């Protein structure tokens, strides 16, 4: 049996950051024809759910264990969103400066890069491309506060399924 090696030089990896986000509004045919740069992304959180074990018994013993389907859920946090995202978030411009909320939400895709690093090359090791598809925005809270002596930009938290 081969001896296990731990903490080898160049084999201690990590992942960090979120950058170069792209929105892909879905067209009526179900395709994603055009990507739009999304500036101001502060976080992209992936929260899968499901995949629960379902034990089955026969002859007084555990016969098998079936695993349920996994569902993807994610949250995008950003200082702003591109104008093209408004339709995906249930907003429609009805006149200059007037927006109607609670409209039908357009499905979309989303992509972003995260940095891959290791103990020898640091953050220059590489990157990972994350692709989300079939997303639909869910309503989320938005707070508007008065400007004061320590203002903070509004941070949108957009929940997607």
Regions found by a protein language model. Give the residues of each.
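Polar/acidic, low-complexity leader/linker segments enriched in S/T/G and N/D
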Residues: 1-45
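Extracellular/virion structural assembly segments
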Residues: 3-9, 62-151
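Alpha-helical protein-protein interaction elements
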Residues: 16, 30, 49, 100-104, ...
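Membrane-targeting and insertion segments and their boundary/processing signals
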Residues: 43-50, 128, 132
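N-terminal "mature-chain" segments and other terminal, solvent-exposed stretches
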Residues: 48-59
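Terminal interaction module
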Residues: 154-157
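Conserved small/polar residues in nucleotide/adenosyl-binding loops
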Residues: 160-161
């Amino acid at each position: 049996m081969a001896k296990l090696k731990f903490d080898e030089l160049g084999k201690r990896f990590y992942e960090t950051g979120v950058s170069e986000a792209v929105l892909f509004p879905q067209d009526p045919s179900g395709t994603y024809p055009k990507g739009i740069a999304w500036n101001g992304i502060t976080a992209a959180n992936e929260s899968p759910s499901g995949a629960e074990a379902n034990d089955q018994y026969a002859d007084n013993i555990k016969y098998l264990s079936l695993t349920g389907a996994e569902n993807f859920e994610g949250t995008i946090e950003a200082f702003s969103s591109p104008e093209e995202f408004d339709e995906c978030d249930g907003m429609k411009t009805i006149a200059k400066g007037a927006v109607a909320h609670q409209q039908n939400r357009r499905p979309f895709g989303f992509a972003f890069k995260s940095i891959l690093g290791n103990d020898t090359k640091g953050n220059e090791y590489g990157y990972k491309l994350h692709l989300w598809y079939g997303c639909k925005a869910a309503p989320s809270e938005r707070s508007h506060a008065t400007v004061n002596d320590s203002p903070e930009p509004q941070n949108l938290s957009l929940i997607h399924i």
